[in-house]
């Protein structure tokens, strides 16, 4: 019985070492562009972003830079907008499935209305936005995908999903 246990352990280690040698799928080529559009919750909002592959083989993945425009309604009488540059590290697990980490920083504008006891007062302010997302993307066609991301920035959605067009 001891011998069978040793054989089983050796077989398991051999399988693990063989599967560890499996190669990741080829990453996106330099010059590939991706346009994303989506909606988010917590708080409700919408996003449009653009990514451009600048390095196609970086730590077994690809590195993109781009920009993002976000809109949200964090509270009943409040709206927020931001324009941010973004940097993303992506890794193709299969030809159809990609995981990524994104960092953003930029400028946000918030406007809101409140009652001061005698009249409605409208005001706004500008602030620095910074945040990040961890997400995934699944291509069900060569150039069309769905994506989901979790993370966020102050006043903007913590969970968002949408579609991506790769060209």
How does the language model describe each region?
Residues 1-28:
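Cleavable N-terminal export/targeting peptides
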Residues 23-32, 55-63, 77, 92-99, ...:
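Short loop/turn motifs that connect adjacent beta-strands in outer-membrane beta-barrel proteins
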Residues 24-33, 67-83, 107-129:
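Flexible, solvent-exposed loop segments that connect beta-strands
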Residues 29-41, 62-73, 105-107, 143-154:
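Transmembrane beta-strand segments that form the barrel wall of outer-membrane beta-barrel proteins
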Residues 31-33, 42-46, 61-63, 77-83, ...:
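Residues that define the transmembrane beta-barrel architecture of outer-membrane proteins
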Residues 39-41, 52, 71, 89-91, ...:
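Residue-level signature of outer-membrane beta-barrel architecture
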Residues 50, 155-167:
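Outer-membrane beta-barrel "beta-signal"
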Residues 57, 69-76, 92-94, 107-114, ...:
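Sequence/structural signature of outer-membrane beta-barrel proteins
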């Amino acid at each position: 019985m001891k011998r069978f246990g040793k054989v089983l352990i050796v077989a398991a280690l051999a399988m693990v070492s063989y599967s560890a040698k499996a190669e990741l799928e080829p990453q996106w080529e330099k010059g590939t562009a991706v346009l994303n559009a989506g909606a988010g919750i917590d708080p409700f909002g919408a996003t449009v972003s653009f990514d451009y592959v600048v390095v196609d083989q970086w730590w077994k993945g690809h590195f993109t830079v781009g920009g993002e425009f976000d809109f949200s309604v964090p509270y009943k009488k409040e709206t927020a907008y931001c324009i941010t540059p973004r940097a993303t590290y992506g890794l193709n697990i299969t030809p159809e499935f990609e995981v990524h980490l994104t960092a953003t920083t930029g400028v946000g504008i918030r406007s809101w209305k409140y009652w001061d006891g005698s009249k409605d007062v409208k005001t706004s302010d500008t602030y620095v936005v910074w945040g990040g997302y961890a997400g995934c993307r699944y291509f069900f066609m060569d150039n069309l995908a769905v994506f989901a991301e979790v993370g966020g920035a102050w006043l903007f959605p913590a969970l968002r999903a949408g579609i991506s067009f790769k060209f």
